[in-house]
Amino acid sequence: MIPSMVWTALGAFLVINAMLLSASLLVFAERRVSAFIQNRPGPNRVGPLGLLQPFADVLKFVLKEDVQPAQSNKFIHSMAPVVMVVIAMTTASLIPFAEGVVVADLNVGVIMLLALTSISVYGVTLAGWSSNSKFSLLGGLRSAAQMVSYELSMGLAVISVVLIAGSLNFMEIVEHQSSGGALLGWNAVRNPIGCLIFIVTAFAETNRAPFDLPEAEEELVAGYHTEYSGMKFGMFFLAEYVNWFIASFFIVTLFFGGYLVPLEPQLIALFPALEGSTLLALLQFVSLMLKVSFFSFVFIWVRWTFPRFKYNQLMKVGWKYLLPIALANAILIALGVVLFGAVGL
């Protein structure tokens, strides 16, 4: 019998490689969708339909010279991109891809997610500080302030889901969303305010437009990674796209039924052999990926639809609007759990 640690290691290996491939596909998808929105062709020269363009970009990063700023802290400067990638890949281990298919099935999975989201601030801050550049430092400080500000609202949105599901385990949160019927059991229907807040804060946490203040080209050149080149810059690039993909996964997992197939109970009633089968697991995985692909498209769509916030507007939205609304929403759901006997902690 194969030990459980071997299965965990194999699962982690597969997830890491899947995230690497997904990041490449996201780069290609963003370029093509952006080109479509801007009415231009997009990459179409490297390989059929430009499909090999992301791999050409990786080769470019590998072959580029790695320039180290003269007065920088060399060790921290080199470790910052590694920290970002490791945290992004670790977060991917919490995603339930189908019923029973998850690398780390933790009873405190939600707390683990919030913890990993919090410590990702360190990679950005250390990159800005260690570069010995005012642009990098300001970009790092902006990013830290932004991420800390929006983590509070994100945490409250997640707490509202935990109160409804009565569990901190992602698998149980997904399964709880099957209790209300085809789509009515989704937390997006039961908790629309929490869903909207989580989506907005996910944009801010991943530094995606219109919340990409740490990389405001007009003010800070490239922000916290201004002084990075070669594969170190490529690692920041990779971490950003992996975080974007993972954010889409957790939006779907927490609010849109995760891997649950619409009308899944009816399908199992018609075909009882489906229950617990490999075919059902494949259907669940396809359902999850379709939902995730939609939200990945939404990230691109929003980037080319809304202008970037000013820094004071960014802070105002986070502290003056999102945080009070998220807190009020969590309190109302907690009262509902107590007064109406809903499933709670």
Curated annotation (Swiss-Prot):
Known PROSITE patterns for this protein? Answer: COMPLEX1_ND1_2
Q: Which reaction does it catalyse?
A: a quinone + NADH + 5 H(+)(in) = a quinol + NAD(+) + 4 H(+)(out)
Q: Membrane-spanning regions, if any?
A: 9-29, 82-102, 108-128, 154-174, 183-203, 241-261, 282-302, 325-345
**Which InterPro entries would you find in this protein's record?**
NADH_UbQ_OxRdtase_su1/FPO, NADH_UbQ_OxRdtase_su1_CS
Q: Which UniProt keywords apply?
A: Cell inner membrane, Cell membrane, Membrane, NAD, Quinone, Translocase, Transmembrane, Transmembrane helix, Ubiquinone
Q: What is its EC number?
A: 7.1.1.-
Q: Name one GO biological process term.
A: aerobic respiration
Record localization? Cell inner membrane
Q: Which GO terms describe its cellular component?
A: plasma membrane
Looking at the keywords, is Membrane present? yes
Manganese recorded as keyword: no
Q: What does the record say about its membrane topology?
A: Multi-pass membrane protein
Supply one GO molecular-function term: quinone binding
Instruction: Give the source's domain of life in one word.
Output: Bacteria
Q: Which PANTHER family match?
A: NADH DEHYDROGENASE SUBUNIT 1, NADH-UBIQUINONE OXIDOREDUCTASE CHAIN 1
Task: Indicate the family of this protein.
Answer: Belongs to the complex I subunit 1 family.
Self-association and partners: NDH-1 is composed of 14 different subunits. Subunits NuoA, H, J, K, L, M, N constitute the membrane sector of the complex.
Q: Which purpose does this protein serve, as stated in its record? A: NDH-1 shuttles electrons from NADH, via FMN and iron-sulfur (Fe-S) centers, to quinones in the respiratory chain. The immediate electron acceptor for the enzyme in this species is believed to be ubiquinone. Couples the redox reaction to proton translocation (for every two electrons transferred, four hydrogen ions are translocated across the cytoplasmic membrane), and thus conserves the redox energy in a proton gradient. This subunit may bind ubiquinone.
Annotated NCBIfam families:
PRK06076.1-2
The protein's matches in HAMAP family, at most eight in alphabetical order, are given as: NDH1_NuoH
How is this protein named in the record? NADH-quinone oxidoreductase subunit H
List the source organism.
Salinibacter ruber (strain DSM 13855 / M31)
